[in-house]
Amino acid sequence: MAKLTKRMRVIRDKVDVTKQYDINEAVALLKELATAKFVESVDVAVNLGIDARKSDQNVRGATVLPHGTGRSVRVAVFAQGANAEAAKEAGAELVGMDDLADQIKKGEMNFDVVIASPDAMRVVGQLGQILGPRGLMPNPKVGTVTPNVAEAVKNAKAGQVRYRNDKNGIIHTTIGKVDFDSDKLKENLESLVVALKKAKPATAKGIYIKKISLSTTMGAGVAIDQSGLTAVVN
C-alpha cells in the first residue's frame, strides 16, 4: 500500500468526505489546505443529471465569470481586414491567417485561446488535428467562432471559462485562484451554475445539478451544500 505523504494525511484528517460543506466553510478549508509553493487554482466539478451518451443531452458553452479566473490569457485570432485590426485593438497577442496557421503547424503555440471569424474557418479547418486534441479548436457553441472577434477577445481576457461535460456527465472547470476573497469565489461559482442551468437540455429529466465539488490544484475535493448557493436555490 502506498505511503501517505504528510500533505495527504492532513487532507484526510481535515476533510469529511461524507459531509456537504457550506460554500464559505469549504473555501476556508481549501485555503487552509493549499500549501503548494504556487497560487493554486480553485477547480469545480459539477455532476449533471444528463445521459452523456445522448448527443441532445450534452452540455457545452462558455460564460464570463464576474471576477475572472486569475489567469493571464494569451489569445490568437484568425481574421483579416477590419476584423484583424479590431482583434489587435481588443488585446489579442497573435492575429493572422495563413501566416498564423504556418506558425501553429511548426509547433509554435504560445497561446491559451483561439478565436476565428467565420470567413477564416477555411484556414482554421486545416488545423483540426493540431488544435482539436488540445481543446483549442474554435467552435461557435462557445463563442470562439464569431463575426465579432473583438468582443470574443475581450471576453477571453475578462475571465471567460468554457465548459463541456465529460463521458460521465461531469463539468470540470476553474472558478479562480485560492487567494481570491471567499465572496468572489462564491459569486464566480454561482455565475457558472446560472450558465449551466440556462444550458440545461430540454430532454434532461430529474435532478439536473446533482453534486458540486470544489478542490484546489493539489488538494482533495470538498462537496458543497447547494442550499447555500443563491443560483441553485432561486
UniProtKB/Swiss-Prot annotation:
Cross-referenced SUPFAM superfamilies: Ribosomal protein L1
GO biological process, one term: translation
MF (Gene Ontology): rRNA binding; structural constituent of ribosome; tRNA binding
Described function: Binds directly to 23S rRNA. The L1 stalk is quite mobile in the ribosome, and is involved in E site tRNA release. Protein L1 is also a translational repressor protein, it controls the translation of the L11 operon by binding to its mRNA.
Gene Ontology, cellular component aspect: cytosolic large ribosomal subunit
Subunit record text: Part of the 50S ribosomal subunit.
Family from the record: Belongs to the universal ribosomal protein uL1 family.
Name used for this protein in its record: Large ribosomal subunit protein uL1
InterPro entries: Ribosom_uL1_bac-type, Ribosomal_uL1, Ribosomal_uL1-like, Ribosomal_uL1/biogenesis, Ribosomal_uL1_3-a/b-sand, Ribosomal_uL1_CS
Record keywords, A-Z: Repressor, Ribonucleoprotein, Ribosomal protein, RNA-binding, rRNA-binding, Translation regulation, tRNA-binding
Coiled-coil annotated spans: none
Organism, as annotated: Yersinia pestis
